[in-house]
A protein has these predicted regions:
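Disorder-to-helix initiation segments
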Residues: 2-24, 101
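Helix-loop segments that flank and shape redox-cofactor active sites
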Residues: 9-16, 30-56, 118-134
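A structural signal for well-ordered alpha-helices, especially hydrophobic packing surfaces
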Residues: 25, 32, 39, 58, ...
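Conserved alpha-helical segments that form or flank metal/cofactor-binding pockets of metalloenzymes
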Residues: 42-84, 155
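Long, contiguous binding/interaction regions
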Residues: 47, 79, 83-87, 109, ...
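Short, contiguous alpha-helical
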Residues: 63, 136-163
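Acidic/histidine-rich alpha-helical segments that form the ligand environment
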Residues: 66, 70, 87-140
Length: 163
């Protein structure tokens, strides 16, 4: 017999989902901090455009961090909440000393690839256990990353920074 949590989901499957969400949380925290560093330190001919875009991205990332942590709590888990835990858990690595706009964009693109893969895993598991709430939280993130990737392609074409 299955044991259900307060929102009617299988407790064991919910724990697995919490682990995935905590992994995503850790990756978003490192992504957020990288974005802050890029925002503060970017230099070059595209400074103004990149500086503003990086701020937009880090403001968005920190909102996602809070929403993911709240979803972990809803699933009766404990969100990771120390930087050392984030560093240990995250696949996204801390980036330091980067001021070149091209390199910043390349790092962001790589990080977005990691995030979208992790979001796909969460969406699949949430669908499997009937967790519509987690799907409602994560699906918009997934769609936003697709839009960001498209905007990045347009930016690269317009500025020719990778050619």
């Amino acid at each position: 017999m299955k044991t259900l949590n307060l929102i009617g989901l299988d407790k064991e499957k919910s724990k697995e989902l919490v682990n995935h969400l905590n992994d995503l949380l850790a990756n978003y925290q490192i992504f957020y901090q990288n974005l802050r560093g890029f925002h503060w330190n970017v230099k070059g001919s595209n400074f103004f455009e990149l500086h503003a875009k990086f701020e937009e991205y880090y403001n968005d990332a920190i909102e996602k961090v809070d929403e993911i942590a709240e979803r972990v709590l809803t699933l009766e888990g404990t969100p990771l909440h120390s930087y050392s835990a984030y560093m240990k858990q995250a696949e996204i690595k801390e980036v330091t000393g980067v001021s070149d706009g091209n390199r910043c964009v390349k790092e962001i693109v790589g990080n977005l690839g990691i995030l979208i893969r992790k979001e796909r895993e969460i969406l699949a598991l949430a669908a499997e256990i009937g967790d519509d709430g987690t799907q409602d939280v994560i699906l918009p993130y997934h769609l936003e990353i697709d839009a960001i990737q498209e905007a990045r392609k347009e930016f690269m074409d317009a500025t020719c920074i990778f050619k």
